[in-house]
Amino acid sequence: MQSWSRVYCSLAKRGHFNRISHGLQGVSSVPLRTYADQPIDADVTVIGSGPGGYVAAIKAAQLGFKTVCIEKNDTLGGTCLNVGCIPSKALLNNSHYYHLAHGRDFASRGIELSEVRLNLEKMMEQKSSAVKALIGGIAHLFKQNKVVHVNGFGKITGKNQVTATKADGSSQVIGTKNILIATGSEVTPFPGITIDEDTIVSSTGALSLKKVPEKLVVIGAGVIGVELGSVWQRLGADVTAVEFLGHVGGIGIDMEISKNFQRILQKQGFKFKLNTKVTGATKRSDGKIDVSVEAASGGKAEVITCDVLLVCIGRRPFTQNLGLEELGIELDPRGRIPVNTRFQTKIPNIYAIGDVVAGPMLAHKAEDEGIICVEGMAGGAVHIDYNCVPSVIYTHPEVAWVGKSEEQLKEEGIEYKVGKFPFAANSRAKTNADTDGMVKILGQKSTDRVLGAHILGPGAGEMVNEAALALEYGASCEDIARVCHAHPTLSEAFREANLAASFGKPINF
């Protein structure tokens, strides 16, 4: 695909844009007009500037397309950058430092501190500073790549037309050859519970609390629930997560990893009520919240009182008022836009990627789809293997996985073998005094091919990318076991687990 990109870019720069086969035949290129009171003409118009949208816009421009990106919010970056992935990682990182300094960890390392105080306002400032810098980075990349940014709510008003309406009611019309919907997702509301982003909050409000709650109840122990719950638990809150399912970590996590993960979080002070459903929440006159819960299968009701209630039951595609109904584009039962393997809707020049289509709601999945989609518009190959898309939970320790879990392999009737290696036997983990967790590798019994990798431990989110590469290239467990890994590193645990899977046992355990 890289070679195609270079050829296409070269041809575009030489003025051969309209002479090559790229799916836009018969339509001449018209120079962009960026005056606010005049229409804009474009080759590609992207609706949404989240990870999928902004990456797609930049890639389209790099391929020679005249590109417009419409964003309804005042800032670029979508949920991920503004109120999701990025600010949450800032708080996870800084709360971890505070937890180490405030607890016994530093003292055990010979670092004695006389007084440790939390300045929550300063911590929030650092988070906001990182977000602001990255938003500015996207704006710079748009300018550098000549992507036209239009502020307003984008609605498809014709097969080749998008209208962006600003908050003041003014609008701008974009005439376009191709339209790419990348509008992302929004928080799924909980029936009967109204979010005010003050004491009853979504993930957005949980990233900007003014003080550490004495007691926090989290509805949902999936990825977002355990991440944000961990932040406030480290900073001093008494945190209880109520989960309808019987495990923590959400959909896709390996059950053995989940059980060990839950044990470690409980050791840190995180409390869980599994197989439990929330039936309602009532605000009291003193400002506290009574959360009513009962067993998922039904049973005796119980009330948990808290200062802040965090609702984390997932996200849903954002497709409202995009003009899809008028175009005859129907949604599937889960509210997603149906697309083919080239991300085309039933109208061939209208595409959709990211959270609005099927697949995991992950920023990096949307980014991949964005790049691949616009390469397809330019006539290139379209390939994505969703089995090779990694998932990460950014707690401490981290959890990461890619490929199949044991449960999935059993369900599919695939014979497999398992290789495991604990971080307690890893030299670098020992020197770091950070040994919780393990690496678990699943290989095909007959071929030794890597089928899945599941990591619980320090640096799991980085290590899983080696596993994703192995899966993408069809590597065997022996292939990885025979790659020399630097010593001492945490990634040696990944090699050792593959040794165990391929040869029956590791070296250092």
From Swiss-Prot:
Modifications after synthesis and translation: Tyrosine phosphorylated.
Residues the entry annotates as binding FAD: 71-80, 89, 154, 183-185, 355, 361-364
Q: How is the cofactor bound?
A: Binds 1 FAD per subunit.
Tell me where in this chain the PTM Phosphoserine is found: 285, 297, 502
One GO biological-process annotation of the entry reads: 2-oxoglutarate metabolic process
Q: Which cofactor does it need?
A: FAD
SS bonds (residue pairs): 80-85
Q: Which reaction does it catalyse?
A: N(6)-[(R)-dihydrolipoyl]-L-lysyl-[protein] + NAD(+) = N(6)-[(R)-lipoyl]-L-lysyl-[protein] + NADH + H(+)
Cell compartment(s), UniProt: Mitochondrion matrix; Nucleus; Cell projection, Cilium, Flagellum; Cytoplasmic vesicle, Secretory vesicle, Acrosome
Modified sites of kind N6-acetyllysine: 66, 122, 132, 143, 346, 410, 417, 420, 505
Q: What is its EC number?
A: 1.8.1.4
Which residues does the annotation list for site: Important for interaction with PDHX and activity of pyruvate dehydrogenase complex? 448, 473
- A Pfam family of the record is Pyr_redox_2
UniProt keywords (A-Z) are: Acetylation, Cell projection, Cilium, Cytoplasmic vesicle, Disulfide bond, FAD, Flagellum, Flavoprotein, Mitochondrion, NAD, Nucleus, Oxidoreductase, Phosphoprotein, Redox-active center, Transit peptide
Where does this protein hold NAD(+)?
220-227, 243, 278, 314
Its quaternary organisation is: Homodimer. Part of the multimeric pyruvate dehydrogenase complex that contains multiple copies of pyruvate dehydrogenase (subunits PDHA (PDHA1 or PDHA2) and PDHB, E1), dihydrolipoamide acetyltransferase (DLAT, E2) and lipoamide dehydrogenase (DLD, E3). These subunits are bound to an inner core composed of about 48 DLAT and 12 PDHX molecules (by non covalent bonds). The 2-oxoglutarate dehydrogenase complex is composed of OGDH (2-oxoglutarate dehydrogenase; E1), DLST (dihydrolipoamide succinyltransferase; E2), DLD (dihydrolipoamide dehydrogenase; E3) and the assembly factor KGD4.
Q: What does the further note read?
A: The active site is a redox-active disulfide bond.
**PANTHER family, per the entry:** DIHYDROLIPOYL DEHYDROGENASE, MITOCHONDRIAL (PTHR22912:SF151), DISULFIDE OXIDOREDUCTASE (PTHR22912)
Q: Which family does it belong to?
A: Belongs to the class-I pyridine nucleotide-disulfide oxidoreductase family.
In UniProt terms, what function does this protein have?
Lipoamide dehydrogenase is a component of the glycine cleavage system as well as an E3 component of three alpha-ketoacid dehydrogenase complexes (pyruvate-, alpha-ketoglutarate-, and branched-chain amino acid-dehydrogenase complex). The 2-oxoglutarate dehydrogenase complex is mainly active in the mitochondrion. A fraction of the 2-oxoglutarate dehydrogenase complex also localizes in the nucleus and is required for lysine succinylation of histones: associates with KAT2A on chromatin and provides succinyl-CoA to histone succinyltransferase KAT2A.
**Name assigned to this protein:** Dihydrolipoyl dehydrogenase, mitochondrial
Q: Which organism is it from?
A: Cricetulus griseus (Chinese hamster)
